[in-house]
C-alpha cells in the first residue's frame, strides 16, 4: 500500500489476495471492537486505514489493488491479457467494502467507508454501466456489496453525512449482475480437460475476443449460470461464498429463482457432499468438492 501511494512499481510482497487478507483482518478486529472497545487496537487499525486511504488516492478514480498496480498496471480486472483469476481485483475490493461496513458499525468512523464507496462506485460504473460480463473469479464481493447496500439503506443520515455520490440500489444491481453473468463467457479455455498453463496462455493471448471474457471453469463456479447449477462444484471456499451471497441477495430482492437455486445447492451440499464434521471440500487438489458421496476419511475439508 505504501508503494502504491508513492507511485512506484514492482516488488509486491506476497500474492495478489494479500490485500483481501489485510481487509479481512480489519473486519475481524472491528467485530472484536464492536463487542469490546479497545483504544489501542482501534488506534492501530486507524493507522492501517490511513495508509490504505493514501494508496487509494493515487489512482484518482477509486481503484485500489496493490498487486495489479505494482506488477501489472495495464491489466486492471484482467483487461489486455491479464489473468483475473490470479489477480483477485474484484475479490479484494469486495473484502475492502466488507471491512469498511464492519469498521463503521464498530467505531462510526468513515475514512475506510469513503474509500470503499469510491471503489464500489468505480466498479459499478466500469462493470454494470458498461454491461461487462466480469464476475468475481473468487466470490465474496457478492455478500460484501449487499452489506454495503443494507448499511446505506438503513442509515439515511450516514448517506447525507458522507456527501458522496451514493445510490445504494446500484450495489444490489451489481451483485445481481455478478450472480446472473456466471456461465456467460467465451466458453474457453477448457479448464476441465486442458492443462492449466495452456489455459492461462490462452487467456493472456486474449483468444476470448473483444467484448467477452474467459471462463473461470467449475473451479470458480463459472461452468454454467449460477441459478441453473444443480450441484455444488469447485473450490470449496469460492463455492460456499458464492451461494452465501445468493442467499443474502435473495433476502433483499425476494426473487423466487434465487430461493429455488440456493435450496437446490444447499440440499446437494448437506446431504451428499458434507462430512459428518460439517467440513466440505473433499479433494486436496484445487481444494474442491468431490462427486456425490465422495467423503474419504483423509479428505481436505474447509
Which residues fall in each region the model found?
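Glycan-recognition and catalytic cores of secretory/periplasmic carbohydrate-active enzymes
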Residues: 1-302
